[in-house]
Amino acid sequence: MTHPDRSAHDLNVPIQHSGRWFQDNLGRTLLLRGINVCGSSKLPTRPYPGSTHLYDDILFWDHRNVSFVNRPFPLEDAHEHFSRLSAWGLTLIRLLVPWESIEHEGPGCYDEEYIDYLRQLIEMMPRYGIKCIIDPHQDTWSRFSGGSGAPGWTFEVAGLNIKHFKETGAAYVHNTNAVPGDPLPMVWPTNYTKLASCTMFTLFFAGDTFAPHRTYQSQSIQQFLNHHFIEAYRHLAERLSDLEAVLAFEFMNEPHPGYIGLDHLDSFDPIMNLLFGDSPTPLQSFALGDGIPQTVDVYIKSWPFPTKKSHDRVINASQTSAWFSGCVWKEHGVWTVDDQGVPRLVNTHYFSKHPKTGEKISFYEDFYKPLVNRYVAAIQSVKKEYYCLVEPLANEKPPVYNEHDHHHNVIFSPHWYDLDSVFYKKFNARMTHDVQCLQRGGNVFSATYFGKRGAKKNYRGQIKNIKEDGLLNMGEKPCIMGEVGIPMDLNNKMAFEDDNYENHVHFMDAIIYALETNLISFTLWNYDVFNDHEYGDHWNGENFSIYSVKKSEEDYMRHDDGNSKLSKKHLYDGGRVLEAVLRPYAAKVAGTPVSAEFNIDTLQYTFSFIPDCKGSTTTEIFVPYFHYGNKTIKTDVSFGRCSYIEEFQTLYHQYELNDPLPKLVTITMGILTTESANSCSVM
């Protein structure tokens, strides 16, 4: 039996696609697995180490003089991290590159030092069989509106004063609020209902429609922002165009419509929006930003609904303005102040109907797709082979693509989390809820599942719906789940004390089971080299990393044998929930995948495919040393034969072309036990 000269998960192959499947140059179907690198890349490294629990009254606001060099990690550490990820079979990296990291100094001023660093980092990837996706990452628009992404100067373009966001309630920024008594982590997503974030997204996607009178340097704000965003990533694409490891550019992480499409402006829908902590209505946000104090509702965590109103409080008693030159929405007649000084809505439907025609607005059709088409065309003008990943709005179906849209090498790339467990930071495998079902109008009884099997059924169904929505709305395109993962600080961080990650393993196993049984490629969230138990991923209280430097130090000391940190034994130091993450998967398939399933309890993996590949008869399955090292592998195959090379962590399945081909080939793999000693085995 002949063997390829590389491992199953080595992606040093040309990657093309046919319909919904990625393929290599031999026509084999590729199922890609990888990781986001990394959460702390949302923050600069200079002038002081970026972390949202840190604040400097001078340096934090000096947003033009920052650097993201060494995000995600210094070049001298790259060998360690790439070696580890390759050994873990996670060879597709979604590389976070926020707009701010490229163009923080000012419009058109690119940080070539940082881009040089990225080039050197990406140049190393082929040695480890790694490819990457460039992710223009953002959360709630920018660091200065409580998230990450856009440069600070974009607020100046819109006329907003970032130093006044706290007093006016325009944004909740952890850096400026990191004192005892403030709301717990997970308050950051509420910025999607706050003035700063909503205004910037509205101007970015639809400023020409909803704010045509507000300009910057004699240009509409929308066109100014769109031009610089697209040009920044087109410039990056040019600088990276000769690097074989760059597979794709994403359009935008978790895009948001801002105010676009809101049917009314006197409240937010609590089913579609997280109300937590201070929760001003859109009208109250307008008034607060314009220096008018407001009494706003304050929400706290509850059950079965995520939050409930606890009390209210007065915001902006100082009558501070968030604007340099007046509220853009008052200027455009959305609201006014009556003779008694009370804010009043003039047109509560302003953002749901076109201001001139009165026609119903569609965010996807009128604003999102046209900009995505422009971006994709710009990126592929540099290199037509680049894939471009397009993400739907969070927890919503994707846009419907028609013949006028840019289809070439466009990939559907949704995200999915168990929002219930992420918000409460609890999981015990006894009960889970289908938040997707609830958001689509289901009731709490039909959306409740019990036990580990129930969790798997719950998640599998949700992922199936997302996949089918993509195929229906965007057409026969591959799907990469761009983000999916679990918080590691579950259940009051008990695992950090007793090192018992059993619940975490069940949680992650149920999620990856849902992905593998739906035959979806994915990049987990996330691998962060700065993760520790106290501050997690160092961004807004999140702690998702499957690697922790704190745990790495403890693991290494626990079984220090004098060998290198990169020896087989130590490559797993620092890993969290690896029992669930590291699992077999058919990476290169000589045909069309039909089904896949891994049993974490028995370590049995079953994979079926239709043997219809014309260019190769070899299927390659990643077999993690973590589970199967120094053990005898047992295989049962319905057709063909198998061999296993432990050094490559790969099980090879082959058949002869001149043999009569069956309709389906099934491969079952596990560990040889005394009970199964009579079965076929490979060493």
From Swiss-Prot:
Inhibited by metal cations Co(2+), Cu(2+), Ni(2+), Pb(2+) and Zn(2+). Not inhibited by metal chelator ethylenediaminetetraacetic acid (EDTA). It is a peripheral membrane protein. It is found in: Membrane. One of its GO terms (biological process) is ergosteryl 3-beta-D-glucoside catabolic process. Keywords: Glycosidase, Hydrolase, Membrane. The keyword Membrane applies. GO terms for molecular function: glucosylceramidase activity; steryl-beta-glucosidase activity. Optimum pH is 7.5. Gene3D superfamilies: Glycosidases (3.20.20.80), Golgi alpha-mannosidase II (2.60.40.1180). Its main location: membrane. GO terms for cellular component: membrane. The active site is at E254 (proton donor), E483 (nucleophile). Its EC number is 3.2.1.45. Specifically hydrolyzes the glucosidic linkage in glucosylceramide. May prevent accumulation of aberrent glucosylceramide containing immature ceramide. This is Glucosylceramidase. It comes from Rhizopus delemar (strain RA 99-880 / ATCC MYA-4621 / FGSC 9543 / NRRL 43880) (Mucormycosis agent).
